[in-house]
Regions:
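Second-shell loop/turn segments in exported
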Residues: 73-77, 108-115, 178, 239-245
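Conserved alpha/beta-hydrolase
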Residues: 90-106
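Serine-dependent carboxylesterase/thioesterase catalytic core
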Residues: 71-72, 96, 117-196, 205, ...
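C-terminal catalytic-base region of ester-bond hydrolases, centering on the histidine
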Residues: 198-269
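Flexible, membrane-associating and regulatory peripheral segments of lipid-active enzymes
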Residues: 2-92, 268
Length: 269
């Protein structure tokens, strides 16, 4: 109870700071340029979803047969995490679906508050609904922060090995970190034996300037089928941090290349 009270006060403070810093009124058009702008908009418009997402009439194309499921991180929501990447993916021809989960705190816009196993159960239900609506056999999942770890739990323990083609994760806390605690006991169980599941393609995209997952190497997987990408190894001048990575042009291009490696596009720094 005490921890939740502290989290509640933190959530309210964070919400107020976001609105004060961005100054976006409730009547503004949806922001897609930065996390801070999108957070403020999502607080003023509870339940808003990112552009290009959650069209349950979408029919997957032959080029992109797997719908893309976007999974936000801790104290985030589908809009503030994916207001830039979601329309990019939709414009590229993907059926895009963005989950909001774990919205149990005093500010609905700040989600992913439940445990990794509970969050993975919500993701499982959401994926089932996407598969039922689209007729697809599998999905690809893109997650940020905790939203990159939750799909791994789903894949290993809740049947996701049968429904997930690939997992692309941005700055996920895959191993214990000096930053905010992420259920180290769950991570130990999740990583035991192998930190990947056979048959799933993994791409883990990280930044050396991550101030939440510390050290940033706690994101990196070692199992078969995974590709680790450090942004600064690709573009040394890139300085994006943890929260901004889902808005970073380089990271977004790497996500799209990971989703469709046969048609990957050149990288521009």
């Amino acid at each position: 109870v005490g921890a939740r009270a502290v989290l509640g006060r933190t959530s309210v403070a964070l919400a107020g700071v976001a609105v004060i810093l961005t100054g976006i009124p409730a009547s503004a058009k949806p922001a897609a340029g930065s996390f801070a702008e999108a957070l403020a908009y999502s607080i003023a418009h509870p339940g808003v979803t990112p552009p290009g997402s959650n069209d349950y009439s979408c029919v997957p194309s032959a080029q992109h047969p797997e719908p893309v499921v976007l999974v936000h991180g801790f104290l985030e929501n589908s809009y503030d995490n994916w207001a830039s990447l979601s329309p990019n993916l939709a414009d590229a021809g993907y059926c895009v679906f963005a989950i909001d989960y774990g919205n149990t705190g005093p500010v609905p816009a700040l989600g992913a508050l439940e445990s990794i196993p509970e969050s993975a159960a919500e993701l499982s239900t959401f994926v089932d609904s996407v598969l039922a609506a689209t007729g697809a056999e599998k999905v690809s999942i893109v997650g940020h922060s905790k939203g990159g770890t939750v799909p791994r739990y789903y894949a290993r323990f809740l049947g996701g090995d049968r429904t997930v083609a690939r997992i692309v994760a941005l700055s996920p806390p895959n191993y214990p970190t000096a930053g905010p605690p992420v259920q180290d006991d769950v991570l130990q169980r999740l990583n035991e034996g192998s930190d990947t599941v056979t048959g799933i393609e993994y791409t883990t995209i990280v930044t050396r300037y991550d101030q939440i997952v510390v050290p940033y190497t706690a994101s990196l997987l070692t199992g078969a089928g995974n590709t680790n990408v450090v942004l600064q190894d690709v573009c040394p001048a890139n300085v994006v941090e943890h929260t901004g990575i889902s808005y970073d042009p380089l990271a977004k291009r790497l996500v799209q290349n990971a989703l469709d490696p046969e048609n990957s596009q050149p990288i521009s720094c």
